[in-house]
């Protein structure tokens, strides 16, 4: 049933998008993934919203979502003009020609990366991947968001590579809905095994006091994953798209405070960070991984 539900989610987000070549908009609608913290996120990016309004000379409305699927649907259905998408959500969205990749976050002009990890609670008898393989049938497994790279795609691909097909190898598989929910479910021993991101999830939850060091035990860490893509609706005018891109590329210099507030959702120190251009081809590795997983063939 959960496998069928996930396939239905993927089918839903791959619905057709608008076909206008030069969409006119009086208010720029920016989709933001806020996870489980919409109020805190809104406060942190308030300055960035004001910066965009000043640079673009138009009202800007931020739309907060608790999942990536809503962002993909929003831009595909012409309800959003700008979105920040996880690598996997970006790949899913590009199955329909609805967006233009603009920028990604960098440190010292170098694209930032992050990692996925598979974990259990600190006192668990599962200490490594061999233990996981041996006891999988006794364990419940939790992914984060269906359209998350680190919280779903990458760990799913890894588990399959070692002979563990999630739906068939584990006692039960669920989607928690977000990175914090995945980690807290395991911390509270409601789920045995979880999947999430290290730098952008676990470390932030530790800093915010949601989890203490040692309450989760890491079993596996992935290779580096390319970071999110900030994209524009392809139906916007070329002039507006270029203005949006320029505003993002210049924000760290023109309004450092607004920039720092925006990226503080993930990074505590923005002094060496900035946005740099990103390109579709940089996400080909994520595409290849997605296409290699039998359960995700519906993205084609």
Placement of each model-derived feature along the sequence:
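C-terminal motif of bacterial Sec signal peptides marking the signal peptidase cleavage site
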Residues: 13-16
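Short helices/loops that flank or line small-molecule/ion binding pockets
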Residues: 69-83, 92, 96-97, 114, ...
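Bacterial signal peptide processing site
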Residues: 18-20
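Extracytoplasmic small-molecule ligand-binding "clamshell" domains
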Residues: 22-91
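A bilobed periplasmic-binding-protein/Venus flytrap-type ligand-binding module shared by bacterial periplasmic
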Residues: 34, 115-126, 224-239
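A conserved helix-loop-strand patch within extracytoplasmic ligand-binding domains
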Residues: 105-162
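Pocket-lining segment of extracytoplasmic ligand-binding domains
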Residues: 137-239
């Amino acid at each position: 049933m959960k496998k069928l539900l996930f396939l239905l989610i993927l089918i839903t987000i791959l619905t057709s998008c608008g076909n206008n070549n030069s969409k006119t908009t009086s208010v720029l609608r920016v989709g933001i993934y806020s996870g489980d913290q919409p109020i805190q996120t809104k406060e942190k990016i308030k300055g960035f919203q004001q910066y965009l309004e000043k640079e673009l000379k138009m009202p800007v409305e931020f739309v907060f979502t608790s999942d990536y699927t809503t962002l993909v649907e929003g831009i595909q259905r012409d309800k959003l003009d700008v979105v920040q998408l996880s690598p996997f959500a970006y790949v899913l969205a590009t199955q329909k020609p609805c967006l233009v990749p603009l920028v990604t976050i960098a440190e010292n002009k170098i694209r930032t990366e992050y990692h996925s990890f598979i974990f259990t609670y600190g006192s668990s008898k599962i200490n490594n991947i061999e233990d996981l393989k041996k006891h999988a049938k006794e364990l419940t497994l939790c992914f984060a968001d269906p359209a998350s790279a680190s919280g779903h795609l990458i760990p799913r691909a890894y588990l399959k590579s070692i002979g563990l097909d999630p739906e068939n190898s584990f006692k039960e598989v669920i989607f928690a809905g977000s990175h914090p929910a995945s980690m807290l479910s395991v911390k509270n021993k409601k789920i045995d095994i979880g999947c999430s991101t290290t730098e952008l999830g676990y470390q932030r939850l530790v800093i915010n006091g949601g989890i203490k060091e040692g309450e989760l035990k890491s079993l596996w860490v992935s290779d580096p994953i390319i970071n999110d893509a900030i994209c524009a609706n392809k139906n916007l005018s070329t002039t507006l798209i270029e203005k949006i891109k320029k505003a993002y590329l210049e924000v760290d210099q023109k309004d450092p405070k607004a920039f720092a507030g925006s990226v503080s959702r993930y990074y505590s120190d923005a002094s060496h960070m900035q946005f740099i251009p990103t390109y579709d081809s940089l996400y080909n590795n994520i595409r290849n991984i997605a296409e290699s997983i039998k359960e995700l063939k519906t993205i084609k």
